[in-house]
Amino acid sequence: MRLPGVPLARPALLLLLPLLAPLLGTGAPAELRVRVRLPDGQVTEESLQADSDADSISLELRKPDGTLVSFTADFKKDVKVFRALILGELEKGQSQFQALCFVTQLQHNEIIPSEAMAKLRQKNPRAVRQAEEVRGLEHLHMDVAVNFSQGALLSPHLHNVCAEAVDAIYTRQEDVRFWLEQGVDSSVFEALPKASEQAELPRCRQVGDHGKPCVCRYGLSLAWYPCMLKYCHSRDRPTPYKCGIRSCQKSYSFDFYVPQRQLCLWDEDPYPG
């Protein structure tokens, strides 16, 4: 009999293959490359890496405009890091690229465990994948800066991931409180103008003077990531077993303080939501 709510095993394009794990070696980083469909319909390649020794997962994709977006989940430290490398428009006098990092608390039910990710394989590498579930837009107000020189105290991944964004690493007061309770040193965090002061500042897209401070907004999307394990039932097994993953898409919108409008030149058009 099939247990209620548990599907029968059937061929899948993405499978958990525990028998292949020994071939990789214990804890060896594993990489999976998949073709994914972006929210605007275009297709790009996404790289997913899992390191079960470090208990971390990283995801990277390039947007059609050349922006490189990455996401790192550090399960040991309860930290997730978003990074965007945004290409500048040289004809407008912008720098070659601008880097941003956003650091928030990781909830362990947001993405599958690193051990499961390391065992993920695909049967058809040419298939274009589209997320099964679209999760709602999450709007975050980043009101604290992270001190890059002390960032390793928060997560050892910060130095590599945010190396190009030394002066543009942001987090939130509520995340800071959580990490301080976990024993993270306060020297990791630096004050930005208070929320009440930032509330009085205009949005950058409303500011014409490139030297004026303002509140910048940046949006990014994780087009496809394994957010949940699937369980199947077989007549040969008394209990459900892991047999695949459920994929999700999620978008984020970050508001943060910049001392000069020049540091937020992309925030020109009205942002949805």
From Swiss-Prot:
The gene is OAF. Residues 1-27 form the signal peptide. Coiled coil: none annotated. InterPro entries: Oaf, Oaf_C, OAF_N. The keyword Signal applies. Keywords: Signal. The keyword Lipid metabolism does not apply. It holds the Pfam family OAF_N. It comes from Homo sapiens. It comes from the Eukaryota. This is Out at first protein homolog. Belongs to the OAF family.
